[in-house]
Regions:
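A non-catalytic alpha/beta surface segment that caps or lines the substrate-entry region
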Residues: 50-99, 103-105, 109, 120
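Short, Lys/Arg-enriched N-terminal segments with co-localized hydrophobic residues
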Residues: 4-21
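N-terminal capping segment at the start of a domain
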Residues: 28-56, 161, 350, 410-411
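Active-site metal-coordination/substrate-binding segment of hydrolases
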Residues: 96-196, 201, 221
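Midchain, well-structured core segments that form catalytic/ion-binding scaffolds
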Residues: 148-151, 157-170, 204-327, 331, ...
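Zn-dependent metallopeptidase/amidohydrolase metal-coordination segment
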Residues: 301-303, 377-430, 435
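Active-site-adjacent substrate-binding region
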Residues: 268-285, 292-294, 341, 351-399
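Flexible, glycine/charged-enriched surface loops at secondary-structure junctions
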Residues: 48-49, 77, 191-196, 279-294, ...
Length: 436
C-alpha cells in the first residue's frame, strides 16, 4: 500500500484493537484514540544513519499526520521541516497574552533495539499476577510482579500493550498523544487558561540527536517541558553526563602453529581491556545516581577488534574519572605490548541539565503543583538516560522532563495504563494553566 494511502487510512478510519473497537467518539478518551493510531505508524530511528536527520524517512509519516491534525485544531502555522520537526504555536487564552510562551516537546521516533514495525496495540484488563501481552511461538510474553513490583498497584486497570512481537511505542508516542489531546481540549474550549504554547515533535531522540536542529528563536518559548518520562508522577530535571567511547584493537595474525611470541590477538586484547573496567559499574548492577560503563557492541577477529561503550554518570567529576579510566586501561595495555595497538576515541553526547535547570526552581515547583492538583504524587527522580531537554537546556531553553505513564520501555513488554494517558493530559492542562 502506498505510504500516503496508509496515512489516510490511519487518519480517517476507525481501528479495531483486539476485542475493543475504538472510534473517534466520546466512547473512548481522545488521548487513547490518538495513541492507538500513532503507535501503528512505524517511526524507528536508525543509528547507522545518524549523520542525517531524520535518520529514517518513516518519521515523516507520523510528522505529517501530526501537522495536519494540528492545523485542523487551529494551529495555522503547523508545519514539518525538512528534518522532520513538527512545529506549531497555539495563541494564549484571553488575559494571558503577556505571559511568556511555554513549550511542550515530545519525540517522534522509537528505538531500534526492539522490533518496532507492525505494532498491534490491544487493551488488557489486568487482574493481577503475570501481565501477558501476547504469545510468540505458542509461548506467553509476560512480565511478572517479581520483575516489576509496580504491577501490584495496577490490578483492575486497563493497560495498552503490544501483541508481544514488537515494542509498543509509548516512548514517546504516549507523550505525543497527551500533548495533542491537550491541544484538542484547548481547541474545543479556548477559554481554558494557558499562555502562548509552542508545540514541537522532534526526530531521532533515541539515537542522541538532542533536538539540535530546533530553531529556539523561532520556537519563541522562555521555558519548556519534554513529556518523555515513565510512570505517571515522574518529574526529572537531572540527567546523566554522557559520552560514547569507541575502542579499537589492532592485532597481528600468525598461523596458530607458529604463533608463540608473534601473534597478537585483537579479540583477546579486547577481553583484557574489558576486564580492566569495574565489573560492578555495569548497567545491570547500578541504579539511582550510580553511573556505568555499558558495552553496546563488539566485533573482533585476530587482526582487528572494535568495541563501543556508552559512559554515563550524573556527577561531572565521576564522569570524567570514568573516561580517564578508559584512557588509562588503553595505555596500560599499550605499555605491556611495547607498542600502540589500542586506541580510544571519545565522543561527548550530552551533559547533566541540572547545571542549568537548578537555576529555575519555579519550573519544578509548578510541575509538582500540577501533579498534586490531579491527585498524583510527584516523584522527583534523576533520569537514568537523557532527553531532548538536556541539550535544549544548555542552548538556553530550560526544559525539565514530565512523565508519560508508560512502563518497560525499549522492549516487547512495554505498556501504558489507559488511566495514565488520561490523567497525564489532565496534568498538562493544569500545568499550562499555572503559566497563564
Amino acid at each position: 500500500m502506498p505510504r500516503h494511502t496508509v496515512l489516510e487510512f490511519l487518519l480517517h478510519t476507525t481501528t479495531k484493537i483486539g476485542a475493543v473497537f475504538m472510534e473517534n467518539t466520546t466512547t473512548s478518551p481522545d488521548v487513547l484514540e490518538r495513541f492507538l493510531r500513532y503507535v501503528q505508524i512505524n517511526t524507528q530511528s536508525e543509528d547507522a544513519n545518524c549523520d542525517q536527520v531524520p535518520s529514517s524517512a518513516v518519521q515523516f509519516d507520523l510528522a505529517n499526520v501530526l501537522a495536519e491534525e494540528l492545523r485542523e485544531l487551529g494551529a495555522e502555522d503547523a508545519h514539518v521541516t525538512e528534518h522532520a520537526y513538527v512545529c506549531a504555536h497555539i495563541p494564549a487564552s484571553a488575559g494571558a497574552e503577556d505571559k511568556p510562551a511555554l513549550g511542550l516537546i515530545a519525540h517522534l521516533d522509537t528505538t531500534e533495539v526492539a522490533p518496532g514495525a507492525g505494532v498491534k496495540p490491544h487493551i488488557v484488563h489486568y487482574e493481577g499476577g503475570n501481565l501477558v501481552c501476547g504469545t510468540v511461538d505458542g509461548k506467553p510474553v509476560a512480565m511478572s510482579t517479581a520483575k516489576l513490583p509496580a504491577l501490584n498497584d495496577l490490578a483492575g486497570e486497563d493497560l495498552v500493550c503490544s501483541d508481544g512481537t514488537t515494542l509498543l511505542g509509548a516512548d514517546d508516542k504516549a507523550g505525543v498523544a497527551e500533548i495533542m489531546s491537550l491541544v484538542a481540549r484547548i481547541a474545543q474550549d479556548p477559554s481554558l487558561p494557558h499562555p502562548a504554547l509552542g508545540i514541537c515533535f522532534c526526530p531521532d531522540e533515541e539515537i542522541g540527536h538532542g533536538a539540535e536542529l530546533l530553531d529556539i528563536d523561532t520556537f519563541g518559548c522562555k521555558y519548556a517541558y519534554t513529556v518523555d518520562g515513565g510512570p505517571i508522577g515522574e518529574l526529572e530535571w537531572e540527567c546523566f553526563n554522557a559520552a560514547e567511547a569507541t575502542v579499537r584493537f589492532e592485532g597481528q595474525s600468525i598461523h596458530p602453529g607458529d604463533a608463540k611470541g608473534r601473534m597478537v590477538n585483537a579479540g583477546n586484547l579486547f577481553c583484557d581491556f574489558n576486564a580492566l573496567l569495574p565489573y560492578v559499574q555495569r548497567p545491570e548492577y547500578t541504579e539511582g545516581y550510580e553511573g556505568f560503563y555499558h558495552l553496546e557492541g563488539v566485533s573482533a577477529t585476530v587482526d582487528h577488534a572494535t568495541a563501543r561503550y556508552i559512559v554515563r554518570d550524573h556527577d561531572a567529576a565521576k564522569f570524567q574519572q570514568k573516561l580517564d579510566l578508559i584512557d588509562a586501561a588503553a595505555s596500560m595495555l599499550n605499555q605491556r605490548l611495547g607498542e600502540e595497538r589500542v586506541t580510544v576515541e571519545i565522543k561527548q553526547q550530552y551533559r547533566n541539565m541540572a547545571e542549568i535547570v537548578r537555576d529555575y526552581p519555579e519550573l519544578i515547583d509548578v510541575a509538582k503543583e500540577a501533579y498534586l492538583a490531579c491527585g498524583v504524587e510527584p516523584q522527583v527522580l534523576p533520569i537514568r538516560g537523557g532527553t531532548d531537554g538536556a541539550q535544549l537546556s544548555f542552548r538556553g531553553l530550560p526544559c525539565p522532563n514530565l512523565s508519560t505513564g508508560g512502563y518497560c520501555y525499549h522492549g516487547v513488554n512495554e505498556f501504558v495504563p489507559v488511566s495514565s494517558l488520561v490523567k497525564m493530559t489532565d496534568v498538562l492542562q493544569e500545568l499550562v494553566a499555572r503559566f497563564a
